[in-house]
Amino acid sequence: MKTIDSIPTSKIQRASKLIQTGAKVGVNYIKYYGDKITKTEEEAKENLNINNASDIYDGLKQMKGSALKVAQMLSMDKSILPRAYVEKFSLAQFSVPPLSPPLVNKTFKNYFGKQPNEIFDTFNATSINAASIGQVHQASKDGKNLAVKIQYPGVAESISSDLAMVKPIAIKMFNIKGKDSDKYFKEVEDKLIEETNYINEVKQSMEMAEACQNIPNLVFPKYYPDWSSEKIITMD
């Protein structure tokens, strides 16, 4: 899978990406009105949904973060979206272009002052899984096999601004109504704030493991605070 060398992180950059995606959707609607002349309404609408789903997903997967997370969560409720959107947006759960190795190395340098191969005995710079807010790499240290989760740049900082931009678009395109939309997007925002707080995740996970250590047959991952930071989590 093709990797990404940069992610739009500023509000202007991310808004520009949404505008570019919106322009493609506008072209798709022009095609749709042309298709209605030569095709049935059902065929024309299906083509519109397929084209829009593809263009919107392509734009969101480059932005990553909360914009892509909204698409992922919408795809879980098949009553909201047409089938073409469900099929495309569900890819956000497991099939997103990962950060390139140089960008991974830069993230480590920013938070540890070292490259990953200076911290671990081995580190696979190619991720084994990439989703909406981060990706996972395999590593090893002192004979232990480790999973290293890296959060995408700018994700936590752009949650509120992303949702403010995406919300009116989603409401209009997918007919999400009134108070339900406010509740839905508040839940998305709260979930994203929680998921991007890596320091708190490590702390809570270690506390839970300690509290449950005497329960038979219950195994928790071991977290390594020395190899974790605001944007990186290392666990076994």
Positions of the model-derived regions?
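Flexible glycine-/small-residue-rich
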Residues: 93, 141, 150-152, 225, ...
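Conserved structural core of kinase catalytic domains
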Residues: 163, 167, 183-213, 219-236
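Residue-level signature of catalytic and energy-coupling elements of molecular machines
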Residues: 71, 136, 148, 201, ...
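Conserved protein-kinase N-lobe ATP-binding Lys motif
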Residues: 93, 150-156, 188-194
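Short, conserved clusters of charged catalytic residues that mark active-site
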Residues: 51, 55, 203, 218
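N-terminal accessory/targeting segments that precede structured cores
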Residues: 1-135, 142, 146, 158-185
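Switch/connector loops and helix/strand junctions flanking conserved nucleotide-binding motifs
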Residues: 156-158, 234
